[in-house]
Regions:
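A short, acidic/glycine-rich surface segment
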Residues: 14-15, 23, 44-49, 111
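Vicinal oxygen chelate
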Residues: 54-100, 107-108
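Residue-level "edge-of-site" marker
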Residues: 17-18, 89-90, 111
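Core segments of cupin and vicinal oxygen chelate
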Residues: 1-36
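A short, polar/charged loop-to-alpha-helix boundary motif
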Residues: 108-117
Length: 117
């Protein structure tokens, strides 16, 4: 939770008890543009590190304004996060659990200056 709240500055909007697994929580972060990112914690359940698999999730792209992108890049730098790939509008990196994320500063509906929608 620290990484998403304090490094990426995504507000925690809801924290509820997971009724399917005792002692577990279900929590949601506001990632902009009316989107939420949800996670479960499973204390005591050793699932091992995150692993990319064929057909699985490649990465989660999160669109932010250019100003917010620059501020988040500074936060990532200060936290010592290594980039897998970067350009003037896109950063690929991993969260502390190994999930691949992308921060994208292109306006919604554009990619690298081209209209996509």
């Amino acid at each position: 939770m620290h990484f998403y709240q304090n490094v990426l500055k995504f507000p925690l909007t809801e924290l509820i008890k997971n009724r399917d697994y005792p002692g577990s929580s279900h929590f949601f972060f506001d990632i902009n543009n009316s989107n939420l990112l949800a996670f479960f914690d499973f204390p005591g359940l050793d699932l091992g590190p995150y692993a990319e698999v064929l057909g699985g999730l490649h990465h989660l792209a999160i669109s932010v304004s250019r100003d917010k992108w620059a501020a988040l890049r500074a936060n990532l730098d200060a936290a010592g996060v290594e980039y897998m790939e970067e350009s003037g509008t896109s950063l690929y990196f991993r969260d502390p659990d190994g999930a691949r994320l992308e921060l994208l500063a292109d306006p919604l509906g554009e990619m690298y200056g081209n209209q996509v929608l």
